[in-house]
Amino acid sequence: ISPDVDTVMYTLAGVANPETGWGIAGDTRATLDGIAAYGVDPWFLVGDRDFATHIVRTDLLRQGEPLSAVIASMAGALGVGMRILPMTDATVRTMIRVEDGWLGFQDYFVGRRHADTVLDVAFDGIDRAHPAPGVKEALLEADLVFICPSNPIVSIGPILGVPGLHEAAAEAKAPVVCISPIVGGRALKGPAAGMLAQKGHEVSAYGVAEFYGGLAPAIERLGKRVIVLQTVMGDRGDRVRFASDVMAALG
């Protein structure tokens, strides 16, 4: 399962579920019901078509196909014309340390509903990873680099943690724009606020800018330009409006 990649792919294919923010719109749950019929708790809520994505991808990976090639093939099959690049073809697993030990991210986030206090975050395998083909070049040759308002610690953090990618983003000739996921001192969803605080950062746009460090410290007193815009996006119209506002602000 590659949750962030799948969300991007489903969104660009026009099949994403707008109510949940993940999965496929109108998906059914016969597989989950079948699992429950055997007395097993189907706590990881994946729809039938979403299961198909994971089954096909797992099969192709077991056949030796690299993740980047698998994603390109699957995105193409869904009619997505844009390139979707994973950060790496290597296996990297997000691990969360809580009071009773280390958990896989989905065990923490979904299984325990991210209720535990996060003591640490680690990315198992990150030190052995290499950027997937085309990722560094995409950063270095881009006209504009957006770091979207995902969780800085567990969504953007592992991408920048792949050896060479933080440097590539910092060396990009294009402007680098970091969008803060913090609104009014809190995250709109998920555990981003608590994770920022655990890492010693202020839960604010300033704290997000501080976390991204040399990439685009977007607070005036850090020496870079700050743009204040409406970042709460409830539907497609809001997203189009926000993208247009950012482009207009950048000139």
Report each predicted region and the residues it spans:
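A short helix->loop->beta-strand "cap" motif at the edges of active sites that frequently abuts
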Residues: 172-176, 224
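An anion/phosphate-binding loop that grips the pyrophosphate of nucleotide cofactors and donors
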Residues: 142
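Electropositive, gly/pro-rich neighborhoods at or near active sites that engage anionic ligands
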Residues: 1-123
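Active-site glycine-rich loop that binds ribose-phosphate moieties when present
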Residues: 119-139
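Short connector loops at secondary-structure junctions
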Residues: 179-191
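Charged helix-capping and loop-helix junction motifs
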Residues: 159-166
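Structural motif
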Residues: 146-148, 177-179
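C-terminal functional extensions of proteins
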Residues: 189-251
